[in-house]
Curated annotation (Swiss-Prot):
Gene: gmk
Species name: Burkholderia thailandensis (strain ATCC 700388 / DSM 13276 / CCUG 48851 / CIP 106301 / E264)
Enzyme superclass (EC): transferase
Annotated protein name in UniProt: Guanylate kinase
Disulphide bridges: none
Top-level taxon of the source organism: Bacteria
Catalytic activity of the protein: GMP + ATP = GDP + ADP
Role according to the record: Essential for recycling GMP and indirectly, cGMP.
């Protein structure tokens, strides 16, 4: 797609309330393999941009500010929240997380797909504002497998693992709110399913209309209920 075509599509799609880029929300309980799958998907599909969240939690080993998260203080986070800078925000395990509204809208308007690694609370907030956002819930093959993965990654103390397992049940209960569910039993199969979801989303009527609006208008095809 040329830049001129993308720009033309954007003009029509913004008027119709649809962006050229898609918004994916990946949700999972801690230890389900969400980050590993997302990183693999991003490495294979350069058309997807990862949204980097703001957080007040401490960096883990190997994490870099501006690459994995925008690490900030509670005071700064609250100031940004008061200024309505976040598309969504939530408190998870005692830490605050928030997603930049401006950055996401800029990416989607320019035709880039955006992926959010997000919790179910944040996904609910995003869905209220972007009805075409696609929710993908990653499930473990069993609770026993989830516990084993949390122990093997060696990032949390035993009491934290216990807390995460207790929270997993309530988090998994929200899987029904997602458009798609991927069971991460084997990495390769789960990744292939994620790729299929992305491909199918890009072929939805609204996505195709937003990216090829001039062609659709020429052919007399319009968005349902478009003004």
């Amino acid at each position: 797609m040329t830049d001129s075509n993308r720009g033309g599509a954007a003009a029509h799609s913004l008027h119709a309330g649809v962006y050229p880029g898609n918004l994916f929300m990946v949700v999972a309980p801690s230890g389900a393999g969400k980050s590993t799958l997302v990183n693999a998907l991003l490495s294979k599909d350069p058309e997807i941009c990862l949204s980097i969240s703001y957080t007040t939690r401490k960096p883990r080993s190997g994490e870099q500010d501006g690459q994995h998260y925008h690490f900030t203080t509670v005071e700064d986070f609250r100031a940004r929240h008061a200024s309505h800078e976040f598309l969504e925000s939530a408190e998870v395990h005692g830490n605050y997380y928030g997603t930049s509204r401006v950055w996401i809208e800029e990416q989607m308007k320019s035709g880039h797909d955006v992926l959010l690694e997000i919790d179910w609370q944040g996904a609910q907030q995003v869905k209220k504002q972007f009805r075409n956002a696609v929710g993908i819930f990653i499930l473990p093959p069993s609770l026993a497998a989830l516990e084993e993965r949390l122990k093997k990654r060696g990032q949390d103390e035993p009491n934290v693992i216990t807390r995460r397992l207790l929270a997993a049940g309530s988090e998994i209960a929200h899987a029904a709110e997602a458009e798609y569910v991927v069971i991460n039993e084997t990495f390769e199969h789960a990744l292939a399913e994620l790729e299929c979801i992305v491909a199918a989303t890009r072929l939805r009527f609204t996505s195709q209309y937003a990216r090829h609006a001039e062609l659709f208008v020429e052919l007399g095809i319009h968005l349902p209920h478009a003004e």
